[in-house]
Amino acid sequence: MAPPLLTLRDINLTFGSNSLLEGAELYVSQRDRVCLVGRNGSGKSTLLKIAAGLVEADSGEKFLQPGTTIRYLPQEPNFSDFETTLDYAQAGCEAGDDPYQAIYLLEQLGLTGEEDPSQLSGGEARRAALVHVLAPEPDILLLDEPTNHLDIEAIEWLEGHLQNSTSAL
């Protein structure tokens, strides 16, 4: 069996005097399907941010297999530096990624790519943010509440897309 792509072991994190994560562990292997369940404020989003490299734990071990790609979908994406949804979607891609994948996914989700991100509805913003992380087809997708603001049609599209994805989720 191949070693995990991502390992978080004995992760501890406090905010002020409050312990948010104590001994948290997460192992993600190729094509895994993992779901974090817990109450509001229990550290699910923070654990995803640690896995994505956006927050540093107070202690514990994080290991990412060399060459592994990760994309993180935050609850509130930042569109402030982008003129169009296509600009934002393609910003998730790196050299070697198919730039047309972003165009294709935007169209699949009912966006043209010409929308001004500052004028998007909640659902449109969520769809653009999904394209930003889905287009590069990373090894690991970290999705923080991916169906927020989506209508049933977009949720069904996302479920189908993720079922066929080779990314670990």
Indicate where each model-derived feature is located.
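ABC ATP-binding cassette signature C-motif
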Residues: 1-169
